[in-house]
Amino acid sequence: MAYHTPFAAQPPVASSGLPLTLISLDDWALVTLTGADRVKYLQGQVTADIDALSADQHVLCAHCDAKGKMWSNLRLFYRGEGLAFIERRSLLDNQLSELKKYAVFSKVVIEPQPDAVLIGVAGSQAKTALAEIFTELPSAEHPVTQMGNSTLLHFSLPAERFLLVTDTEQAQQLVEKLAGRAQFNDSKQWLALDIEAGFPIIDAANSAQFIPQATNIQALNGISFTKGCYTGQEMVARAKYRGANKRALYWLAGNASRVPAAGEDLEWQLGENWRRTGTVLSAIQLNDGTVWVQAVLNNDLAADSVLRVRDDALGTLAIQPLPYSLAEDK
């Protein structure tokens, strides 16, 4: 079987019923940072403590504007001798132009890697399948491994899965090895798993709209409140210490006559009436017809609240439990 992407689209499946699946991640992009000042420069730009990031760890963090609003979130890790991050392709160009603004004063080269191949490996026996190709795999304790031109990331949520950053040759080997055993799917399957995991999806429609805490990045250990200065730090800190953040990321599931687009609002039932509320970050329809919506809503919303896609008289959406706690450390 020849390797080419994107893989043919299939209706996404929830993690509990997902067979072994290779997923082409064409909706995501890879960026690398190299040069002597790569760590120092990024330390002044993102919410995570880059000085504390080890070579066997990855972190989801935010890149903010001066008002603390996220240009994007980034899945950040070491790759080879440099740093790398993965973000949604829809906002790549704009986010990079912001990130590079002051790079001319530092010894750092920031560039997209359009030839890099991003493949997700998820579902039943994902670890066993990868072990046939790679002698060392990442784990929950050590979620990043490097082998030659390949970097492997491990994710525990919503169920064990892996993200492979590699080249075309290695991708071809993986496809050939697992053809006949694995399903193939496109980016929407990985998107569904991220929604189920409660990982915020920031696309171009929602860039520079939310502080990181409105999308639960603090609950995913993506914000350091003890590191030095970075762009937007004052607003991010104020949200924590002055209780300025009144929003949170939610996972909703139910039925809908259409899949809402990023940036749309939803409707919340109040007695006999419906009130517009919140912002959709991402949404997907599964193989069983269920619609999943990831949205930013008021953080005091009752767990039994009923919502729906805007103007959808026949649909209802219910709040689903996230696989992590939003309780703040005191």
From Swiss-Prot:
It holds the Pfam family YgfZ_barrel. GO terms for molecular function: folic acid binding. GO terms for biological process: iron-sulfur cluster assembly; RNA modification; tRNA processing. Keywords: Cytoplasm, Folate-binding, tRNA processing. This is tRNA-modifying protein YgfZ. InterPro entries: GcvT/YgfZ_C, tRNA-modifying_YgfZ, YgfZ/GcvT, YgfZ/GcvT_CS, YgfZ_barrel. Folate-binding protein involved in regulating the level of ATP-DnaA and in the modification of some tRNAs. It is probably a key factor in regulatory networks that act via tRNA modification, such as initiation of chromosomal replication. Gene3D superfamilies: 2.40.30.160, 3.30.70.1630, Aminomethyltransferase beta-barrel domains. It comes from Yersinia pestis. It comes from the Bacteria. Folate binds at W28, W190. GO terms for cellular component: cytoplasm. It is found in: Cytoplasm. Belongs to the tRNA-modifying YgfZ family.
